[in-house]
Structures are given as structure tokens and as C-alpha cells.
């Protein structure tokens, strides 16, 4: 009995000693994990380029828009040439100019390795403002397929909102992502109320209406990724901002095809 009691006491002591040791080992392993994670992030910052403000800048930032720019210029020129003379041609010119400004300034901002914070800040303000201009510009030629009683009120509201958004982003350059996204999505959803009228309009019809809706969905999906800063498919190369840019390219493609269909039917 004495032997058994002694063995039990020994086991209890060993167990009591092992617990703190296991806890120490766990804490040490956790500390090593945190250190490795910090080292990895530091190495990632050294490998991944940064902008003038010190923010990480994945290598493919802006290249989607740079590739899209010459295609956008060509599409805009052809669209203006085939558009009927008068207000419709002017509307197509406005749309083309807003698209070229969007992709051109974005490529200039994101691809060129600016080191001047002042230049970067100005280009950022223009970049954010262009979002509102492309939304208003896209709606302009499409609205000429509808009656004047619908066209002019919508043009007034959309361009007024675009002007407000543009001024806001020029004055409030450091606006948080969520504030920018909320205004962007609200303005993008405004034309949704026109979808029934577009569906039945002789110069628009179902095909162009579906393309317009899909383009809007692509813009909104990209903006959502920008707001939540996810996903980041290839860290250091292709992250949430690049996903946002792809959304704008897909949205533009859907819309420019739809506008071609509308203009050819006018």
C-alpha cells in the first residue's frame, strides 16, 4: 500500500510538472508562429512595390486598364462615326470621353511608379471622380432611345449626382472605401428603374437591356470587392483592387456593346 501511494504521489508530481512545461512549450510555439508571420509580412512588403504613400501596390495594378485603353479609344471613335448626327453623336462623344478618361487616368496612376505624393493625390482624386463620370456618361446615349419626358429628368438627376460625387472626391481625397462605395453603388443603381422602359423601347429591347444590367452587376461586384478588400487571389500580384478593375473592364465591355446596339437602331 505504501508503495502504491508512493507511485501515485510520484505520478501526481510528474503530472504537475508536465503541465507548466506543456504550457511553456505552447507559448513558445505560438511566439515562434507570430515571429514567423511578422517576418513573412516584412519580406512581402520588401518584395511587393509600394506607392508614394507607402501602401502596397501589387505588380498587376493598373495593367487591366492600360490594356483596355487602346481598345476603348478605337471603340469610341467608331461609335462616334456611326452615330446619327446631332444630340446622339454628342452623347456618344461624351460617353467615349468619359470611358477614355477613366481607363487613361487609372493606367497613368497605377502603372507609373510615382514617387510624388502630391501628383499621386491629384491623380487619385481624378480617378475616383471618373467613376461618377463613367456612370453618367454611359447613361447619356442610352437615354436618347427613350422619350424626352423620361430622358431629360434622368439626365438632369444623373449628371447632378455625378457632379456632386466628383466635387466630393476632389475635396475629400481621403474618403474611406465604404463611403466611396456607398455613393458609387447608389448612383449605379439609379438607372435600374429604367430597365422596364428600356426592355420595351424599340431601339433598345431585351438584348441590350440584359447587357446593361449585366454591366451594372459587374461594376457593383467589383465595388463590393474594393470595399471589403477581398478576395486577394494572388497576393503581391493580383489582389482585391485588381478584382475591382476587372469588374470595371467587364462592365464597360457589356455597356459598350449595348450602346452599339442602341445607336445602330436609332
Indicate where each model-derived feature is located.
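Multi-pass alpha-helical transmembrane bundles in non-GPCR membrane proteins
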Residues: 1-266
Amino acid at each position: 500500500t505504501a508503495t502504491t501511494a508512493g507511485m501515485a504521489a510520484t505520478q501526481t508530481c510528474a503530472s504537475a510538472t508536465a503541465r507548466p512545461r506543456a504550457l511553456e512549450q505552447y507559448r513558445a510555439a505560438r511566439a515562434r508562429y507570430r515571429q514567423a508571420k511578422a517576418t513573412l509580412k516584412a519580406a512581402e512588403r520588401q518584395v511587393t512595390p509600394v506607392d508614394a504613400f507607402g501602401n502596397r501596390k501589387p505588380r498587376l495594378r493598373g495593367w487591366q486598364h492600360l490594356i483596355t485603353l487602346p481598345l476603348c479609344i478605337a471603340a469610341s471613335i467608331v461609335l462616334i462615326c456611326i452615330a446619327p448626327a446631332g444630340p446622339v453623336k454628342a452623347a456618344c462623344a461624351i460617353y467615349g470621353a468619359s470611358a477614355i478618361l477613366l481607363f487613361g487616368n487609372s493606367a497613368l496612376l497605377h502603372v507609373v511608379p510615382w514617387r510624388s505624393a502630391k501628383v499621386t493625390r491629384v491623380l487619385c482624386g481624378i480617378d475616383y471622380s471618373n467613376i461618377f463620370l463613367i456612370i453618367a456618361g454611359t447613361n447619356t446615349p442610352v437615354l436618347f432611345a427613350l422619350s424626352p419626358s423620361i430622358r431629360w429628368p434622368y439626365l438632369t438627376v444623373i449628371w447632378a449626382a455625378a457632379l456632386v460625387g466628383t466635387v466630393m472626391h476632389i475635396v475629400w481625397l481621403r474618403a474611406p472605401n465604404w463611403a466611396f462605395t456607398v455613393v458609387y453603388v447608389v448612383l449605379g443603381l439609379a438607372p435600374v428603374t429604367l430597365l422596364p422602359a428600356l426592355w420595351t423601347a424599340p431601339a433598345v429591347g431585351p438584348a441590350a437591356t440584359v447587357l446593361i444590367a449585366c454591366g451594372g452587376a459587374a461594376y457593383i461586384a467589383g465595388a463590393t470587392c474594393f470595399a471589403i478588400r477581398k478576395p486577394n487571389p494572388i497576393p503581391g500580384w493580383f489582389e482585391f483592387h485588381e478584382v475591382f478593375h476587372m469588374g470595371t473592364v467587364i462592365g464597360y465591355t457589356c455597356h459598350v456593346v449595348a450602346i452599339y446596339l442602341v445607336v445602330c437602331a436609332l
